[in-house]
């Protein structure tokens, strides 16, 4: 494992301590990456990791304590370090990269054309604090730490990064346009690495899920030996409780046991244990199921309203027939709609959002009580016609369940779309992709779709002037009026990791 947080932590925030693996007969090596912890050199982010990783693997394979086979594990940054290398012959014999992706723009820094705001600033400042510690800059470290403890980092974090850690890779991300691929890095493991035995561990409430699914799809495409587990977890919570929600006893993490079985098979030659190709946790029925990420369940709802779906949370409808009506609502930057839970929240996970849906700047559409069980498996997608009176707006979407036996509104997943330019003034079709999920609604439950023009601080508040803006609402932010026409609106389900043949079919090939 190679990580940028100090090797003594050893990712024990989510995994068992390396001593547990050592007691099972493994030599476990945890390294500081270049310019972090006690390692020399300058930290440059991911672009240093291919050559440094090769050097580490070569050294380890030649160590007298190594039997010649090497496995790697780790999540987030430590996940990507396993996948990068320039010499194919040095590739690990087995990999277990969790919660990471290959595309800096789409898998690490933004969604729907908008920067991850709170998440990116929080992580960037953590990296900056390590830079301050290494140069013994106590005042700068104190300022960063105080901003994180108080929440002030959401408004001054960008300035703190620029002042105290100007080469920070996350600062560079926040200075780039997430609507354009220009200037962003993408990493591509060689075919040999993708064909190695790979164990992919993901979470429904983790921001890097889409990156992990893309990695699974690429490995499958070239015949890789890949197992995929998707639990109900967030980035740092891998047990039954994620935030304030209890996912049941089956959600208690078996990650270390899974990894041990995986490495025993591929590094020590133990007999293989029967494993499902993909195991996913159903967030409502609270059990593990075998599913194919290349397929999705069937879902088709349209949106209908007589114009009061913002003023009343119970007026808008999700209907199996055609959509009808229109809704006008106003985004006031002085009181932007909060983002809550989901995969982009600092409070990640399933959350109650009934109070948010009661706001008059949130547009709600609810189904009738279901007559039969409804499984949601895949990536929800909303398509509708929408215009604004400014050259910029955000569309922030939440999908929730209204359980039959309570007054709760339990948010299941979210998505965001940022639009900039004069085309925002035209009534045009807009499409939002939400976080993938597996959740089975019971007969009598209802499904709800909620629309807003902000999700602060998960994403920066759109200033409405055609620019991305500085984060929080400021003196130049505009009031934005949004108008949606619901004819031809559609809430559908798409595969979360389409098989190559399905992708070609959609392209008409």
Residue spans for each PLM region:
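Alpha/beta-hydrolase active-site loop
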Residues: 45-64
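Glycine-rich "HGGG/HGxG" loop immediately N-terminal to the catalytic nucleophile
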Residues: 11, 35-45, 239-240
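Alpha/beta-hydrolase fold nucleophile elbow
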Residues: 64-77
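Conserved alpha/beta-hydrolase "acid-adjacent" motif
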Residues: 207-213
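Short amphipathic alpha-helix adjacent to the substrate-entry channel of hydrolases
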Residues: 3, 11-29, 216
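Glycine/threonine-rich phosphate-binding loop and adjacent beta-strand/alpha-helix elements that clamp
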Residues: 255, 268-509
């Amino acid at each position: 494992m190679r990580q940028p947080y100090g090797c003594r932590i050893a990712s024990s925030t989510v995994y068992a301590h390396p001593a547990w693996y050592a007691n099972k007969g493994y030599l476990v090596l945890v390294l500081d990456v270049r310019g972090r912890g006690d390692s020399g050199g300058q930290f440059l982010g991911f672009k240093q990791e291919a050559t440094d990783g090769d050097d580490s693997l070569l050294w380890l394979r030649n160590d007298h304590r190594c039997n010649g086979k090497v496995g790697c594990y780790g999540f987030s940054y430590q996940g990507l370090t396993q996948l990068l290398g320039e010499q194919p012959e040095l590739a690990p014999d087995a990999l277990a990269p969790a919660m990471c992706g290959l595309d800096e723009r789409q898998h690490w820094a933004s969604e729907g054309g908008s920067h991850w705001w709170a998440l990116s600033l929080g992580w960037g400042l953590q990296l900056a604090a390590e830079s301050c510690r290494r140069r013994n800059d106590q005042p700068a470290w104190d300022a960063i730490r105080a901003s994180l403890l108080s929440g002030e980092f959401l408004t001054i974090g960008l300035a703190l990064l620029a002042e105290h850690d100007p080469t920070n890779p996350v600062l560079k991300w926040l200075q780039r346009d997430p609507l354009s691929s220009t200037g962003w890095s993408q990493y591509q493991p060689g075919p040999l690495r993708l064909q190695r035995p790979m164990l992919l561990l993901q979470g429904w409430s983790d921001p890097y899920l889409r990156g992990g699914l893309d990695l699974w799809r690429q490995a499958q495409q070239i015949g890789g030996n890949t197992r995929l587990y998707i639990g109900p977890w967030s980035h740092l919570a891998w047990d039954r409780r994620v935030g304030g929600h209890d996912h049941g006893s089956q959600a208690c993490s078996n990650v270390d046991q899974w990894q041990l079985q995986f490495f025993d098979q591929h590094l020590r030659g133990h007999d293989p244990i029967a494993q499902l190709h993909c195991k996913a946790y159903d967030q409502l029925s609270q059990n593990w199921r075998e599913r194919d990420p290349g397929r999705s369940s069937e879902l088709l709802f349209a949106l209908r309203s007589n114009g009061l779906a913002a003023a009343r949370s119970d007026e808008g409808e999700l209907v199996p027939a055609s959509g009808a009506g229109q809704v006008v609502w106003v985004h006031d930057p002085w009181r932007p709609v909060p983002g809550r839970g989901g995969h982009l929240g600092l409070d990640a996970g399933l959350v109650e959002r009934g109070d948010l849906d009661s706001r008059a700047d949130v547009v709600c559409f609810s189904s009738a009580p279901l007559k039969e069980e409804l499984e949601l498996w895949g990536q929800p997608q909303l398509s509708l016609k929408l215009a604004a009176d400014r050259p910029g707006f955000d569309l922030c979407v939440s999908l929730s369940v209204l359980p039959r036996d309570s007054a709760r509104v339990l948010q299941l997943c979210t998505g965001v779309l940022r639009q900039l330019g004069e085309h925002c003034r035209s009534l045009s079709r807009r499409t939002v992709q939400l976080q993938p999920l597996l959740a089975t609604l019971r007969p009598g439950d209802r499904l709800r779709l909620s629309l807003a023009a902000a999700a602060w601080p998960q994403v920066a508040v759109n200033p409405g002037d055609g620019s991305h803006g500085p984060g929080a609402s400021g003196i130049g932010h505009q009031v934005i009026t949004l108008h949606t026409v619901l004819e031809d609106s559609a809430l559908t389900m798409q595969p979360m990791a389409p098989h190559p043949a399905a992708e070609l079919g959609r392209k008409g090939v």
